[in-house]
Amino acid sequence: MTLEAIDVHHGYGDETVFDGVSLSVSPGEVVAIIGPSGVGKSTLLRLFALFDSPDRGSITYEGSDVWSVSENHRLDIRRQIGMVFQDASLFDASVKRNAEYGLRVRKPWSERIRHELASIVGRTNGTGPAVEALETVGLDDKLEQDATSLSGGEAQRVAFARALAYEPDVLLLDEPTSDLDPRNTAVLEEAILEARERGIGVAVATHDMHQAERIADRVAVLLGNEILEVGETETVFEAPRDERTRKFIDGELIY
């Protein structure tokens, strides 16, 4: 269930964003994609989420090129990939209904029925996949609260729970804590680590290198249209192979 970018070239018009980028996200690991703002971290996540197709190279899932398979197969793959954007978008409904949304639209019919039944039972006994996901982010005490009344940090936690509830194979997070206070940041980081323990592969795009050190098993350094290096987090931070990586980590490179 590995999601992988292989020698990906991508751009918009005359602007080159990636010139031969390769990166994998495997089950049960957290990969942090670090780099300054505007370098293409979000674009890489969009490619992983199958929102965009690369100009050259391939995105593969379980070894199959996702843009070479049938549309129905690609839709099945999309259902295995969850994404949480930087700015959470919630509906005018309860916290629980927002967390259930992914179960209703992302799963095949057979799975939707199973999760809907679990959700109905959960309304009487306080369980179910959405409730369990909300417990993970510490919001199971706000199930019936209007989601639009939540703080920004709480809304981001609901968005994470919504993606987690339908049990994706891969979870993509785009600067998930960039505007959050320390408490909400800590809750989400703990939830990310719990997702890893469940066997979910997690890719986090972040400019916060301290966060990458706290939660990531591996780090990919994205600078200047390419990934300079990928490696175990401690190794990249303590003994980077590329001099540009060292300068970026030390704050000597300004983009």
Indicate where each model-derived feature is located.
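Helix-to-loop junction immediately C-terminal to a conserved catalytic motif
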Residues: A49
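Conserved ABC transporter NBD signature motif
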Residues: G57-S68, I77
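Conserved ABC ATPase "signature" region
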Residues: K107, R112-K142
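ABC ATPase C-loop
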Residues: V158, A163-L164
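A short, proline-enriched helix->beta-strand linker immediately N-terminal to the Walker B motif
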Residues: A165-D169
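Catalytic Walker B motif of ABC-type/P-loop ATPase nucleotide-binding domains
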Residues: L171-D174
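A short, surface-exposed alpha-helical micro-motif characterized by mixed small hydrophobic
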Residues: A212-R214
